[in-house]
Amino acid sequence: METFDAHDVVYLLMPDRWADGTHDDPEKKRAMFEGMADDRWNPAFDHTTETDGVMARHTRHGGDLAGMTAHLDYLQDLGVTTVWPTPLMENDNDRYSYHGYTITDYYRVDPRFGTLDDYCHFVTKAHEMGLKVILDMVVHHCSAQSFLYADKVDSAWFSTDERQIVTNFRPYAQSDPYLSDYDKQQLTDGCFFITSAAFNGCNAQVQDYVIQNGLWWVEMTGANGIRLDSYPYNHFEAMNRWCMAMKAERPGMNIVGETFMSSPVAVSYWQQDSPVGDRQSLLPSVMDFPLNDILQTALDEETDDWETGLTRVQKYLGDDRIYAHPDHLMTFLSNHDINRFVKTWDEGHNNLRYKQALTLLLTIRGIPQLYYGDEVCMSGCSDRYDWGQRQNFPGGFPGDETNAFEQRGLSERQREYYEFTRLLLNWRREPAVNRIIAEGRFIHHVVSNGIYVYARELEGKMITVMLNGTWEEHTLETAPYADVMPADSALEVITQRRISIGETLTMNQRDIFILDWT
């Protein structure tokens, strides 16, 4: 099985907020929702009013597998190579079920998204178009309305009979050498929401159940890899057993765990072969939340040569020895649990901030992941209900005046974001370029005069990136960069013009050069 790795660019989407592919068949749409605990859907709630605002946050908007399948061509043309939908398993809860993370039936596609056949068709169609699919799974907890909890035969399947224990939301607890056993247990045994129930991960039957379920979904759908939700909340040895079982049945299949922590030491602890672990994890890939923390703020700063702006990026990458396999880190600007990279529409006017961040994401080490709408300047901040960063994708729902799928009605700013994203993604996908970035060694220079210079090199072929992190024009002497400037001219990827390399090179404010020497 072909899996996902640093050669790929992953596109994360929330099916309910992506596209409604059944809106032109109202009878079928009603049937998909009929009999569900939450049988409402409306993509057009006015979230600015108090009543509709709450409804918009809680209620489904009607996106489905048919919509996902119908717009695979958009993703292929954009230039991504892998699709990661949030969970599609049944979430038959009274409210707040659209996100997919409180599962009621682990062996059923939520009928409001479609059927198992629809899911398999989506994966098959993606494969035909050269796209891979990541399966999103939740093994720490299920819905409190699941028959597994509500009708449980054996209470030992769950951490507690009553749901009084709430997790302490301290995912670093298991890697902290000094933390009390009480705090560690509260992390693993506590539920996330009042609507969920935490599995007893130490129970062998529970382990068998979630292992068999993972194998079943991979076998049935043909997915290329797995993303595991809330990985550090699970019992360490139980997850090792889970990973071992997946690898035995699907050798080489990548598994990435959500490691939502700002400490690189805490994140590294969960990756296979970690140099900081006191026990051996079997998880191949982890999520680079520490880098995301830096990117969210560093590109708002004026870069100096010691502490701020791009210097923070350079210094963080310089600490990569903390990770056993830096190339297996999933890197990202936004996702469904945090602020979008563009937090407000007004902030989005600074398109150079996004362009520099995307350039970094697509050319440094790791497995880059985009969040739906990044490419058209979707903005929003996380709030209590996570509404801000989970809006509808423009063009996915009836009545949308803006249609990003068809490039209709986009503002000048949205179009500029889209064209830049598409340009870089399709360039990165070119076979020769792709190998250099995914497999090549990484070389960087210290930031000088606010300019960060780094390169990827493989088998004598090189790509060099230069970023001006200041709002001033700078002229730099090229002699110190001879190791990453191997010829007297190069193709600049963004402008598609050749640049002659003399004794000096001038960069405008917040400028970007991507120099292809191949």
Please provide the spans of the model-predicted regions.
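C-terminal beta-strand-rich structural cap/linker in extracellular carbohydrate-active enzymes
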Residues: V9, I501-T518
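Hydrophobic faces of well-ordered beta-strands that scaffold small-molecule active sites
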Residues: V9-Y11, V83-P85, V133-L135, I226, ...
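Short, flexible loop/turn elements at secondary-structure junctions
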Residues: M14-R17, M89, Y107-F113, V139-H141, ...
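Soluble or luminal CAZymes and related metallo-dependent hydrolases
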Residues: R60-G67, G114-D118, Q205-V210, N234, ...
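Solvent-exposed beta-hairpin/edge-strand motifs
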Residues: P480-Q496
